[in-house]
């Protein structure tokens, strides 16, 4: 876990400890549940919860159209949160190669979907992922799979963007990583402010992308450019 220096704060006459940044696999510095229930047990419990929701919105869960709804919703939730059962090491699976390449590698327009952790409504968009190798490169499909793994969890877009960047930095130790994500959030479209057409853009720049303006501008220009195919 990474700590960053900050002035001591005084609460009830005592100095607090330095703030701790959450690891990419944790939330607010707390470890995830170490032993989630087996998939079939989790599925049964989710089905019961969905049935309770149906009853409390005024529906009859025993009518024909809703008989299989708890099962369908539980299976959908297991799929949409399948990133919790994946690990970075297993996902990469050794697909790192010493190619001696030291110029930017960019995979853009990676479609993704995730669930907002506040309302459990979808947000959908595109990710643009780039890195400058330190001689080693990773299989291109793995960049998309890293996005997918972290997106298939309950998320906020800001954290998702940072997690993807830090994961690539961890497995490659490159000269720099840049990630930009653009998404529309159903929690802003279907409820609350109800603003269809609004997009949220987040970025995470590490290494030379953060330190060197020309490198950062090259990346931003490349993701603005529309391909001719």
From Swiss-Prot:
Keywords carried by this UniProt record: GTP-binding, Hydrolase, Metal-binding, Nucleotide-binding, One-carbon metabolism, Zinc
One term under GO cellular component: cytoplasm
CDD domains: GTP_cyclohydro1
EC number, UniProt record: 3.5.4.16
UniProt key word Magnesium: no
Gene3D superfamilies: 1.10.286.10, 3.30.1130.10
Pathway info: Cofactor biosynthesis; 7,8-dihydroneopterin triphosphate biosynthesis; 7,8-dihydroneopterin triphosphate from GTP: step 1/1
Keyword Nucleotide-binding: yes
Binding site for Zn(2+): 116, 119, 187
Gene Ontology molecular functions: GTP binding; GTP cyclohydrolase I activity; zinc ion binding
Regions that span the bilayer: none
Biased composition annotated in UniProt, kind: Basic and acidic residues: 24-33
Biological process per Gene Ontology, one example term: tetrahydrobiopterin biosynthetic process
Start and end residues of each stretch annotated as Disordered: 1-40
Pfam families: GTP_cyclohydroI
Reaction(s) catalysed by this chain's protein: GTP + H2O = 7,8-dihydroneopterin 3'-triphosphate + formate + H(+)
Binding partners and assembly: Toroid-shaped homodecamer, composed of two pentamers of five dimers.
Similarity annotation: Belongs to the GTP cyclohydrolase I family.
Descriptive protein name: GTP cyclohydrolase 1
The organism of origin for this protein: Thermosynechococcus vestitus (strain NIES-2133 / IAM M-273 / BP-1)
